[in-house]
Amino acid sequence: MAVKVEYDLKRLRNIGIAAHIDAGKTTTTERILYYTGRIHKIGEVHEGAATMDFMEQERERGITITAAVTTCFWKDHRINIIDTPGHVDFTIEVERSMRVLDGAIVVFDSSQGVEPQSETVWRQAEKYHVPRIAFANKMDKTGADLWLVIRTMQERLGARPVVMQLPIGREDTFSGIIDVLRMKAYTYGNDLGTDIREIPIPEEYLDQAREYHEKLVEVAADFDEHIMLKYLEGEEPTEEELVAAIRKGTIDLKITPVFLGSALKNKGVQLLLDAVVDYLPSPLDIPPIKGTTPEGEVVEIHPDPNGPLAALAFKIMADPYVGRLTFIRVYSGTLTSGSYVYNTTKGRKERVARLLRMHANHREEVEELKAGDLGAVVGLKETITGDTLVGEDAPRVILESIEVPEPVIDVAIEPKTKADQEKLSQALARLAEEDPTFRVSTHPETGQTIISGMGELHLEIIVDRLKREFKVDANVGKPQVAYRETITKPVDVEGKFIRQTGGRGQYGHVKIKVEPLPRGSGFEFVNAIVGGVIPKEYIPAVQKGIEEAMQSGPLIGFPVVDIKVTLYDGSYHEVDSSEMAFKIAGSMAIKEAVQKGDPVILEPIMRVEVTTPEEYMGDVIGDLNARRGQILGMEPRGNAQVIRAFVPLAEMFGYATDLRSKTQGRGSFVMFFDHYQEVPKQVQEKLIKGQ
């Protein structure tokens, strides 16, 4: 039975939990779901009187959230947790999660401080202007040190951390937490962490607590003149005033409040949930999203449940029980189950069969999702990641889509057994539907299945999923760069296909002019035939012949791009002409034209951003130059340097390993496809020789 929910945007939090791989993201997430699930059991929130009996399952299999978004409750607030991946090859995954969340918890391992991968996650959150709070986890571990976390946040991230809590005890004697804003202390009476006791701050911690309370008031005064006046007059601001000021500083991206605990030992998680409610933004606190009308006008879309419907699809998942799930965020209006929506990206109408909300271990059917909320839709067939959905009669806006970079690396794949061929094709089609940066095609000459993706790791994971989820074992070739070919001068050619010996003959004759186009233009076909010298029913056949022949260029067999073909003359035979004959004539003509047009090879050029500590900068730049890179510029970010460059993809294989050794594991990089450009002469000769 679908459940209706009382709705208040102020009480909604859409957050991500981001971390270095081993900082304890999963455990933190599990514990959050456990405590919020307990509330369901106690029955304070009557949404569907859901019972989440977690501990049993946790013991059995250590839950890890796989849903793209999981919903839970805390203190009358709904919290949607959006899963964020930890790895850079999945920039699309991170982009897609950063696009739909409003705030984040960044988890650090207290014994390690800020690790290289946490730097990457942090920079991504910065790029999307996501307000965040930090959780210093594993405070019970040997070597745990809150001050290491604070120091490395300042040094490596250039952040302004604000100490919100102090630990009672350290490492294995860690037993409680001091809240320096409210000047209270909490200890735990049991291992589950459910028995929290408020106690006076222990004598030996009082001075330190007062010192940090004072510092907190100073920070708050930066964001609130009223507190500033009180502070100058020696008056104590109220708890509400302090919370409001720290909230404002966090949402304005000026400060990062730091909390602490041990998720594994169930300490500090409820206080972290309080912090999500207190300091992270609701959909009303963030700037409105922008959309574009069909006329190209940019409009702002405000989170109003009574406004026109506008939603963004941010992930597709195949679910064993209900089929294809489309995860969406509603930015405006209300989406109701059973309604029709219009996909403005595709120009298609779709029906919403059912709406689901994912809890950690069950799904709940709901009647509607309102502005600001996230959930999953069952029944959409055409919609993919980055598409915009609007109401049937709502204005046809398109939301800024999630940028989907072009795949740049190709690998040939075949099933280990012939019997698996059909299974492999179906599995690849399913995976391509889920992940817009993954493509499947057939090589025009060898007939091999080619899979294309964003990087080596990306394709390794796809192959791994084939085995695990679809039970298909596959052999894969070596990764190849997706080259292209084109011409550099205009040419005029004719193609004749004439066979006239006994019986019905073949007759097709065309004259074409072929010209180079600017990079990225693709293919343009112009029909300039006048006076019916070629009957119009044969024109599409000529175009088809040309397009098919362009799949394999004369130099190294890669597709030909960026040309304009004008069909301007030719002739036909009353009896012997056929579509087939004109198709062959077209293909003969274009093959000759490309040969004569001084063909060149184009290679994908990547926009590479390397983040490295200052001291390794010289080495990193030297290495990029050696890889035929073109340095575009540098900028400090925190106290690292970001180097931007264009580098040919062919030179980037194995770069992750090289960069790690050059920067002792502290450098990180992201790369996106930017454009194709002509390869240098000596590289072209090498490629042709290597054929």
Curated annotation (Swiss-Prot):
Signal sequence, start to end: none
Chief location of this protein within or outside the cell: cytoplasm
Cell location: Cytoplasm
Single GO biological process annotation from the record: ribosome disassembly
A GO cellular component annotation in the UniProt record: cytoplasm
CDD domains linked: EF-G, EFG_III, EFG_mtEFG1_IV, EFG_mtEFG_C, EFG_mtEFG_II
Limits of the tr-type G domain: 10-284
Record-level Gene Ontology MF annotations: GTP binding; GTPase activity; translation elongation factor activity
Annotated binding of GTP, by residue: 19-26, 83-87, 137-140
One Pfam family per UniProt: EFG_III
Record keywords, A-Z: Cytoplasm, Elongation factor, GTP-binding, Nucleotide-binding, Protein biosynthesis
Role this protein plays: Catalyzes the GTP-dependent ribosomal translocation step during translation elongation. During this step, the ribosome changes from the pre-translocational (PRE) to the post-translocational (POST) state as the newly formed A-site-bound peptidyl-tRNA and P-site-bound deacylated tRNA move to the P and E sites, respectively. Catalyzes the coordinated movement of the two tRNA molecules, the mRNA and conformational changes in the ribosome.
PANTHER family with a match to the protein in the record: RIBOSOME-RELEASING FACTOR 2, MITOCHONDRIAL, TRANSLATION ELONGATION FACTOR G-RELATED
Family: Belongs to the TRAFAC class translation factor GTPase superfamily. Classic translation factor GTPase family. EF-G/EF-2 subfamily.
Protein name: Elongation factor G
Species whose genome carries this gene: Thermus thermophilus (strain ATCC BAA-163 / DSM 7039 / HB27)
